[in-house]
């Protein structure tokens, strides 16, 4: 969870950096990097969620939704991402999601966070996920 809160909200995270600092079970893409000098990072796991241009997800063994929600809330607060907004209609919620929330990054950008459980390679796993939606018109 620490790796998620430390790195996943950074707009400067790249696929190479994600590979170096996130646990082995992570999923990352950034189709519209914050810095023009950074290369596009195509999806490393599941296909990109429709309507998003970035995902950072960490998964680990066990059921720890409550701790995951606390981790996400603390990371959002630390980054100053505090403006609540509605999860957009039609957003593709992950199977197993037990917590979902949306926050405004700026007037044109929204991030959606999800925490939940699902079957993993050795039993139940908990996932922490943040996806950045494509810019609003």
For every predicted segment, state its role.
Residues 1-3, 73, 130-134:
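Short N-terminal helix-initiation segments at or just after the protein's N-terminus
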Residues 29, 39, 47-53, 60, ...:
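Exposed acidic/polar residues on beta-strands and adjacent loops within beta-sheet cores, strongest
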């Amino acid at each position: 969870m620490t790796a998620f809160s430390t790195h996943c909200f950074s707009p400067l995270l790249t696929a190479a950096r994600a590979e170096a600092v996130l646990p082995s079970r992570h999923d990352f893409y950034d189709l519209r990097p914050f810095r023009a000098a950074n290369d596009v990072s195509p999806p490393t796991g599941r296909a990109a969620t429709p309507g998003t241009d970035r995902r950072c997800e960490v998964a680990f063994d066990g059921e720890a939704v409550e701790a995951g929600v606390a981790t996400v809330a603390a990371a959002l607060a630390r980054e100053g991402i505090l403006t609540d907004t509605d999860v957009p209609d039609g957003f593709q919620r992950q199977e197993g999601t037990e917590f979902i929330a949306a926050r405004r990054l700026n007037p044109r950008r929204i991030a959606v966070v999800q925490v939940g459980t699902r079957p993993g390679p050795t039993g139940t796993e908990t996932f922490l996920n943040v996806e950045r939606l494509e810019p609003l018109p």
